[in-house]
Amino acid sequence: MEENIESVEEWVSKLDIETTKDIHVPKLLFDQVIGQDQAGEIVKKAALQRRHVILIGEPGTGKSMLAQSMVDFLPKSELEDILVFPNPEDPNKPKIKTVPAGKGKEIVRQYQIKAEREKRDRSRSIMFVIFSVVLLGIIAAIVLRSITLIFFAIMAAAFLYMAMAFNPVIRNEKAMVPKLLVSHSSTDKPPFVDSTGAHSGALLGDVRHDPFQSGGLETPAHERVEAGNIHKAHKGVLFIDEINLLRPEDQQAILTALQEKKYPISGQSERSAGAMVQTEPVPCDFVLVAAGNYDAIRNMHPALRSRIRGYGYEVVVNDYMDDNDENRKKLVQFIAQEVEKDKKIPHFDKSAIVEIIKEAQKRSGRRNKLTLRLRELGGLVRVAGDIAVSQKRNIVTASDVIAAKALSKPLEQQIADKSIEIKKIYKTFRTEGSVVGMVNGLAVVGADTGMAEYTGVVLPIVAEVTPAEHKGAGNIIATGKLGDIAKEAVLNVSAVFKKITGKDISNMDIHIQFVGTYEGVEGDSASVSIATAVISAIENIPVDQSVAMTGSLSVRGDVLPVGGVTAKVEAAIEAGMAKVIVPELNYNDIILDAEHINRIQIIPARTIEDVLKVALVNSPEKDKLFDRIASIINNAKIIKPQKPVASTRAGQNVA
């Protein structure tokens, strides 16, 4: 049963605050996640038990925040530093050693001090030998009374210095110093590593290329080893968004790391000198949080998903939440959080809070719901704050939010606005008068971009009926870069206008044109528009051009709900339409801004007959059409269910 909650204005007026500055913002990141209670509990449980998680949902719904909050609930295990040591037996297979957090730096420092001491001792020895040679030369020159011996002694000392100073064995004092791959302090929290979009080397580790590979100039293999994100996330959380975009080889490597809890580091490029280097297995005991949109499952490695499912949880996050008292308070908390995080914008007063909540209602696209696409809603909060700052005010008001909505229109909306102006100038659609076979349909752009906001546009549809080239070989020809679903919608609608008109269309070619759809058409929300245009063309009944319409259509003529209905109604208003026909089931989903209210008559339709009554201009032909429709309905056969017949089995009597 739906809760009858009061209007947003009344609800906000009862809040015991002046601005969002009076709202308490939780310190714990987990408590800042809005509207994901069920997903939050699962993630918390997964963290406590060190389970892996797949989070699936729309962008901006809090998946990364949920993943990041897991580090606060991970069991307090001892973090470890990871060191890589040279391997005297096989230089291309460096050794790996783990020590408690904070000890790695001490060990490296001890080796560095030892190397520096050995270097100083060796330098003293070299200088002693050089001075000895020079001194012997001077003594010999004095004894033999030959100044040339001093010159030869100096030359010998110089050659000796160069030979000893540039000797690879002597020069590589630091070759035995280990490299610290992963470092922590004893007070660090478990690491959270975001590896979204990382290439193979950054994700799995890599061995840098060595341009000097011989002659004593090469860099020791262990010094060229670089830890990957899977190793940096050891004892912590590894987060990968858009998991399906990872290469299959990388997904397979992550699967191996999950199974073994360790993974060796090797060169990722076959052309690199590091390609021949492979370390001992490096610890990588992490909790994997994989996230993605709804299409992520299709391209995810089956074995990796099976591993996560077998040792963890799969969670679908919410796109919207119920519009009730508790969730409205969460939205107010969200506004306060965004202001605190940004640190550059002022707080919001009550009037601004009202506008943000109304926008959340509108973007949900459903009645009695609030959107959870909060990243984009946060963008509106920041733009409104920027406007207030530019006007040198220390409070954000409703006027700032309204101005922000106009200023921060998505690209699709800006393009659509320009497109509508061009279409008006060149009259590709009309807003008055009547035309046979021409309908003002409505569509949305941006539905496939992943954005929360839909942008509505007027989609003129024209139908024309011509005799078929060959008898009995009539075709339905639809043009306008139609997608698969749109093509199927045209075929489905053909059943409706065959039934409504009652005419044999096998001798007709029905041409349907989607005007100006250079970017293509996809979806079935133009079904009622197609049916109306074709019926108008077949029956020669004009269509009222001040009417716009949207809705899907079943083969039986029922008008079905569609998406983005608010954006479509707004497009009809901006185009100057007087009426708009929408599916009856979508009627309560329409949420208009104050600037759009009472500017258009919204007519709900349950069947195609409801659409035709409004869209077709009154005429004798229209009366005949509806008389025909009435006779079809009256003559429809009603099939009564038959009583079930009792069945008998051999050897049984049924009473």
UniProtKB/Swiss-Prot annotation:
The catalytic residues are S525, K568
Q: Name one GO biological process term.
A: regulation of DNA-templated transcription
Kindly report every residue range on the membrane side named Cytoplasmic: 1-123, 167-655
Domain Lon proteolytic per the UniProt entry, residue ranges: 433-618
UniProt-annotated binding residues for ATP: G57, E58, P59, G60, T61, G62, K63, S64
Write out the entry's keywords from A to Z.
ATP-binding, Cell membrane, Hydrolase, Membrane, Nucleotide-binding, Protease, Serine protease, Transmembrane, Transmembrane helix
E.C. number(s) listed in UniProt? 3.4.21.-
Q: Which GO terms describe its cellular component?
A: plasma membrane
Where is the major localization of this protein? membrane
Question: How does this protein sit in the membrane?
Answer: Multi-pass membrane protein
Q: Which GO terms of the molecular function aspect are on file?
A: ATP binding; ATP hydrolysis activity; ATP-dependent peptidase activity; serine-type endopeptidase activity
Location in the cell reads:
Cell membrane
Spans traversing the lipid bilayer: 124-144, 146-166
Q: Which residues lie on this side of the membrane: Extracellular?
A: 145
Complex and partners: Homohexamer. Organized in a ring with a central cavity.
Q: Which family does it belong to?
A: Belongs to the peptidase S16 family. Archaeal LonB subfamily.
Any idea what job this protein has? Answer: ATP-dependent serine protease that mediates the selective degradation of mutant and abnormal proteins as well as certain short-lived regulatory proteins. Degrades polypeptides processively.
Against PANTHER family, the record matches this protein to:
ATP DEPENDENT LON PROTEASE FAMILY MEMBER
**Protein's name according to its UniProt entry:** Archaeal Lon protease
Q: Which organism is it from?
A: Thermoplasma volcanium (strain ATCC 51530 / DSM 4299 / JCM 9571 / NBRC 15438 / GSS1)
